[in-house]
């Protein structure tokens, strides 16, 4: 398997992965249904989308996302004070059949490296409260629970953050 930065030419593969995963979810509240436009924005600077490929098959993604609107700006929800340059970890998707291989945790760490290289020192993420697998992965990677709130037009989400050390 190969980890690499996704390019605009990978957009359809990412959309397909998102749709396959979303369609298979028994509880749709676990994942926000992402529009093609939102996914395309994850490929545009200053955002970075990392993908794991098994030959020509996209099997997992993770996104470093720099918020452009208040709904996506989780830093302000934290109420932290200090010299922070925040960004978000967003949209971790792992194809069925590739789960349990540590790909989400690998992507979390790789997105952190990208964030540090770009000068970000605080990462925020949201996770559905009933998504124990993702919650455990973020906690194992040192993220701290902040609070539970309604986001994204009515979806309940736990908010987590991590201060990055250069």
Name the predicted role of every residue range.
Residues 1-16, 27:
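A short beta-loop-alpha structural element at the N-terminal edge
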Residues 15, 19-41:
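Conserved GNAT-fold acetyl-CoA-binding loop/helix
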Residues 55, 61-91, 152:
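Conserved acyl-donor/pantetheine-binding loop and adjacent beta-alpha core of acyl/acetyltransferases
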Residues 94, 100-113, 136, 140:
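Conserved acetyl-CoA-binding loop-helix of GNAT-fold acetyltransferases
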Residues 99, 125-135, 153:
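Conserved beta-strand-loop-alpha-helix junction that forms the acyl-donor binding cleft
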Residues 115-127:
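Conserved GNAT acetyl-CoA-binding A-motif
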Residues 117, 129-148:
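Conserved active-site alpha-helix within GNAT-family acetyltransferase domains
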Residues 150-166:
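C-terminal "cap" of GNAT-fold acetyltransferases
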């Amino acid at each position: 398997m190969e980890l690499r930065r996704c390019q605009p030419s990978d957009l359809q593969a990412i959309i397909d992965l998102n749709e396959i995963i979303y369609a298979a979810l028994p509880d749709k509240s676990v994942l926000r249904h992402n529009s093609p436009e939102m996914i395309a924005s994850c490929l545009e600077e200053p955002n970075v989308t990392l993908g794991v490929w098994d030959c020509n098959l996209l099997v997992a993604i993770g996104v470093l996302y720099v918020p452009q609107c208040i709904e996506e700006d989780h830093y302000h929800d934290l109420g932290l004070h200090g010299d922070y340059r925040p960004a978000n970890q967003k949209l971790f998707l792992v194809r069925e059949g590739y789960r349990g291989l540590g790909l989400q945790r690998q992507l979390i760490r790789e997105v952190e490296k990208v964030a540090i290289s770009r000068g970000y020192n605080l990462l925020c993420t949201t996770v559905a409260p009933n998504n124990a697998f993702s919650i455990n992965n973020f906690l194992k990677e040192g993220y701290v629970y902040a609070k539970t709130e309604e986001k994204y037009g009515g979806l309940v989400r736990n908010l987590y953050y991590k201060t990055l050390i250069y």
